[in-house]
C-alpha cells in the first residue's frame, strides 16, 4: 500500500472533490482517480460515494480514515528520520493554534523555524479548544498551541502564563480601577465570545459558577473588543490577545486575579516526528526567549 495513494485519499476525504485534490497535490484529476481506484482495489471495497457534486466517504471509508492517516504519518516520519540521518532536515507539519496565537506568536515562530529548517513545510490550522481536541484525537495535526485540553489523552508542554483581564468601555466607572470584582460579571451586560466552545471564557465562567447577562455573542475576540469599545457591554480575555490592537478599551485585572496557561498539546511526544520535535523546540525557544518555559 503506497503512501502516495493514502495521501490522495486523505486529501479527497477532506476536500470532498477529486479536482481540488489534484490541484492541491499537483496531479491531474485522472491521476488522482487512478490512485484512489487502485487503493480501493487493494482494499477490496469502495472508499467514496461519487456524484457530480464531488465525493463523500462510505462507511468503510470512514473506518479506514484514521488507519490510512497513520500509514501516511509513519511514512513521513520514516522520510524525516532518514533525511536527518543523512544530515538534511525535511518534511511537512500541520500545526493547530488559537486565533490569537496565530496572529501574535506564529509569524515569529515560523520565521525562525524556516530559517533553520527550510526543507520543512508547515501548514497552519486556526481553531478553538473543541476543534483542536478533535484534530489531536484524529491525529490530523502534529501539535496544537492553546490552553491545556481536558483529560490526559495528550502530552502537554506548558509554555506561557497569561492573565485574564476584564474588558471595559473607557467610560465605565471601573475603567481606571485597580481591579474588577469577578462576581460583577453577572451584573453587567456581557459580550460572550464563542459560547459553548470550551473557550477560556467558558472555562472561567463554569469554574466560578458565574452566569452573566449575555447581551451579544461573537465569533472572535476582535469583534468583542470593538463592541466593548463602543460601549455595548463588558467582556474579558487574555492580555496577550489585544497586545497589538489600538483602542480605548480598559483592561482591568480581576479580583481575585485569574490566569490561563498556554502551551503545546501533542498526540504523543514520544511518537512525534523529528520535524515536529524540532518545531516544538523552536517554538518554545522563540516564545520564552531561550528560557525553558513554565
What do the PLM-derived regions correspond to, one by one?
Residues 11-28:
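Short helix-boundary/capping micro-motifs
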Residues 40-57:
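A short LG(V/I)-centered, amphipathic sequence patch enriched
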Residues 42-43, 64-86:
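Alpha-helical linker/hinge and terminal dimerization helices associated
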Residues 86, 153-164, 168-190:
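Flexible hinge/capping segments at coil-to-helix
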Residues 90-152, 217-218:
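Central regulatory/effector-binding core of bacterial HTH transcription factors
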Residues 128-133, 137-140, 147, 196-250:
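Hydrophobic hinge/microswitch elements
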Residues 153-158, 162-163, 177, 223-271:
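Beta-alpha-beta core module
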Residues 188-209, 272-281, 290:
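Secondary-structure junction motif
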Amino acid at each position: 500500500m503506497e503512501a502516495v495513494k493514502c495521501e490522495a485519499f486523505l486529501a479527497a476525504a477532506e476536500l470532498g472533490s477529486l479536482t481540488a485534490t489534484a490541484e492541491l497535490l499537483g496531479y491531474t484529476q485522472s491521476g488522482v482517480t487512478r490512485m484512489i481506484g487502485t487503493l480501493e482495489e487493494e482494499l477490496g471495497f469502495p472508499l467514496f460515494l461519487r456524484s457530480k457534486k464531488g465525493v463523500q466517504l462510505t462507511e468503510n471509508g470512514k473506518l479506514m480514515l484514521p488507519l490510512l492517516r497513520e500509514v501516511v504519518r509513519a511514512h513521513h516520519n520514516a522520510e524525516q528520520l532518514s533525511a536527518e540521518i543523512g544530515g538534511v532536515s525535511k518534511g511537512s507539519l500541520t500545526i493547530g493554534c488559537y486565533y490569537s496565537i496565530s496572529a501574535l506568536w506564529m509569524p515569529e515562530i515560523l520565521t525562525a523555524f524556516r530559517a533553520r529548517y527550510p526543507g520543512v513545510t508547515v501548514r497552519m490550522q486556526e481553531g478553538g479548544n473543541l476543534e483542536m481536541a478533535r484534530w489531536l484525537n484524529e491525529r490530523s495535526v502534529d501539535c496544537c498551541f492553546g490552553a491545556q485540553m481536558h483529560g490526559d489523552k495528550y502530552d502537554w508542554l506548558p509554555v506561557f502564563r497569561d492573565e485574564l483581564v476584564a474588558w471595559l468601555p473607557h467610560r465605565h466607572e471601573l475603567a481606571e480601577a485597580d481591579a474588577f470584582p469577578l462576581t460583577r460579571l453577572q451584573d453587567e451586560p456581557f459580550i460572550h465570545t464563542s459560547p459553548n466552545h470550551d473557550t477560556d471564557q467558558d472555562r472561567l465562567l463554569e469554574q466560578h459558577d458565574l452566569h452573566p447577562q449575555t447581551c451579544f455573542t461573537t465569533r472572535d475576540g476582535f469583534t468583542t473588543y470593538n463592541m466593548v469599545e463602543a460601549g455595548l457591554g463588558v467582556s474579558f480575555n487574555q492580555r496577550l490577545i489585544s497586545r497589538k490592537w489600538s483602542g480605548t478599551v480598559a483592561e482591568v485585572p480581576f479580583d481575585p486575579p485569574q490566569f490561563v496557561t498556554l502551551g503545546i498539546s501533542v498526540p504523543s511526544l514520544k511518537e512525534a516526528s523529528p520535524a515536529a520535535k524540532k518545531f516544538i523546540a523552536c517554538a518554545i525557544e522563540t516564545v520564552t526567549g531561550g528560557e525553558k518555559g513554565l
